[in-house]
């Protein structure tokens, strides 16, 4: 399967009554940047042999069309980062390795270095490297070293995209982070979706940053994120591939 994490898998569960297919989190992405698109042939093969029921990721059931490709986000972020002239502080889900590679790619293309901030970012980066990913990118630099680099030559990739109190982004915005200082004229890019329930604290964070003279860029005003979950058309495709038996709820 394809998702914003690496190497996701669906489960084919053989039961006495028949096969149950559990998709896990997934989407269809013809150009996922990191990893592979879903194995359509395998899904069709499972469908031909009969599927009693499918338990399917329906996070975006109310979103029409398709979720979009990571490659299109890369092109958009490259344009955005290319026009910004001061320090960039970017936050995303640490587990989204494709987005991480995208940010390293865009940083190199725009003459910037990357500094990872937050334990989860370092942990996922290390795990991805150990699994053979993130090989052809520039090396990240320590946040303490990044303080000596001019503002237009650095991008910080931080944890805390959902406004977590102890996340790096919140500490930076509160001016309590020991290594990253945010200044008037800098830009913060929220390259993630607001998880339902986090709206209030994130909008409060956005407002505080704007009040301090920081440019805030999010999916509400720029194209900076695609979901790791399927929209309706992708769910329809999966139903056609697998042909699970109709079930009345």
Model-identified regions with their sequence ranges:
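Short glycine-rich or small-residue beta-strand-to-loop segments that form or flank ligand, phosphate
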Residues: 87-92, 189-191, 243
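Generic long, charged, amphipathic alpha-helical segments
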Residues: 213-228
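Active-site neighborhoods of metal-dependent hydrolases
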Residues: 133-136, 146-207, 211
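Conserved small/polar residues in nucleotide/adenosyl-binding loops
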Residues: 241-248
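His/Asp/Glu-rich metal-coordinating catalytic cores
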Residues: 1-147, 167-177, 200-202
């Amino acid at each position: 399967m394809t998702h914003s994490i690496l190497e996701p898998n669906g489960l084919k569960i053989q039961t006495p009554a028949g096969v149950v297919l559990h998709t896990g989190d997934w989407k269809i992405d013809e150009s996922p940047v990191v990893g592979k698109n879903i194995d359509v042939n395998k899904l069709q093969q499972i469908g031909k042999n009969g599927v009693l029921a499918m338990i399917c990721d329906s996070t975006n059931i109310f979103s029409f069309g398709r979720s979009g490709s990571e490659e299109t986000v890369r092109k958009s972020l490259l344009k955005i980062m290319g026009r910004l002239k001061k320090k960039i502080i970017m936050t995303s889900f640490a587990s989204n390795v494709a987005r991480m590679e995208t940010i390293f790619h865009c940083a190199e293309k725009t003459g910037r270095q990357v500094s990872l901030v937050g334990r989860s970012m370092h942990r996922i980066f290390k795990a991805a490297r150990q699994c053979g990913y993130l090989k052809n990118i520039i090396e990240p630099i320590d946040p303490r070293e990044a303080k000596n680099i001019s503002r237009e030559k650095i991008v910080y990739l931080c944890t805390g995209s959902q406004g977590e109190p102890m996340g790096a982004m919140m500490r930076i915005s509160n001016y309590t982070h020991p290594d990253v200082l945010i200044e008037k004229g800098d830009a913060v890019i929220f390259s993630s979706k607001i998880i339902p329930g986090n709206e209030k604290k994130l909008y409060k964070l956005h407002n505080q940053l704007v009040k301090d003279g920081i440019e805030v860029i999010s999916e509400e005003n720029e194209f900076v994120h695609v979901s790791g979950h399927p929209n309706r058309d992708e769910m329809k495709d999966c139903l056609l591939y697998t042909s699970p038996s109709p079930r009345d709820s």
